[in-house]
């Protein structure tokens, strides 16, 4: 039996997509949450000096989207054909661009940096959020299935639904302009295995 181990900090963050794919697949895995104080000792042993990591029977893979793509292919949620897979990857890459664009806001909001949160919300987060959720809305509309690509769940649905859930928890009014993503989040998180994971995973602030 294949042994999967996901190593990340004790938060959701970039490690959550791997956990959710494995949970969706009903696959047992080792959820290795590394405390901040232990990270300096672990860091030199990682391929790129960062987390998350996926270990598959001892073989190590780094980078969250590489991990997500590998697991999605293993468990059949990477699109039903080569074109769908490419579309899924394009949305995933754009989602990463979105997170990079709004990163200054979230770094201050989460207490990892100092800055004017109100100004960052107005000048960085809201423009980035509206722009990129507008892009993603076009994919939802084009698919016409309630999913972002094709007619079944893919790993980008997990990515976007988790982020939407986090935004709703922080400020439900944020999604008033994009009600289709409230419906999308509810659809994705109604999956029995995902629902079980969300109910039983460790409670973390982000």
UniProtKB/Swiss-Prot annotation:
It comes from the Eukaryota. Transmembrane segments: none annotated. The keyword tRNA-binding does not apply. Its EC number is 2.5.1.18. PROSITE patterns: GST_CTER, GST_NTER. Glutathione binds at residues 8, 39, 43, 49-51, 63-64. GO terms for molecular function: glutathione transferase activity. One of its GO terms (biological process) is glutathione metabolic process. Residues 81-206 form the GST C-terminal domain. Conjugation of reduced glutathione to a wide number of exogenous and endogenous hydrophobic electrophiles. May play a role in the detoxification of reactive oxygen species produced during pathogenic bacterial infection. Belongs to the GST superfamily. Sigma family. This is Probable glutathione S-transferase 7.
């Amino acid at each position: 039996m294949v042994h999967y181990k996901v190593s990340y900090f004790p938060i959701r963050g970039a490690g959550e997509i791997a956990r959710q794919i494995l949970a969706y697949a009903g696959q047992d895995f080792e959820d290795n949450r590394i405390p901040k104080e232990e990270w300096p000792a672990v860091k030199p042993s990682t391929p790129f000096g960062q987390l998350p990591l996926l270990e598959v029977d001892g073989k190590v893979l780094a980078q969250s989207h590489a991990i997500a793509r590998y697991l999605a292919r293993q468990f059949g949620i990477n699109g039903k054909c080569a074109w769908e897979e490419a579309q899924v990857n394009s949305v995933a890459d754009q989602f990463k661009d979105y997170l990079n664009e709004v990163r200054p806001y979230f770094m201050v909001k989460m207490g990892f940096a100092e800055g004017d949160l109100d100004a960052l919300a107005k000048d960085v987060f809201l423009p980035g959020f509206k722009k990129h959720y507008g892009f993603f809305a076009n994919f939802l509309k084009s698919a016409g299935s309630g999913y972002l690509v094709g007619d079944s769940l893919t790993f980008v649905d997990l990515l976007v639904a988790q982020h939407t859930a986090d935004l709703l928890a922080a400020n439900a009014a944020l999604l008033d302009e994009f009600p289709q993503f409230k419906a999308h989040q509810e659809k994705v998180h109604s999956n029995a295995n995902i629902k079980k994971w969300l109910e039983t995973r460790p409670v973390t602030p982000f």
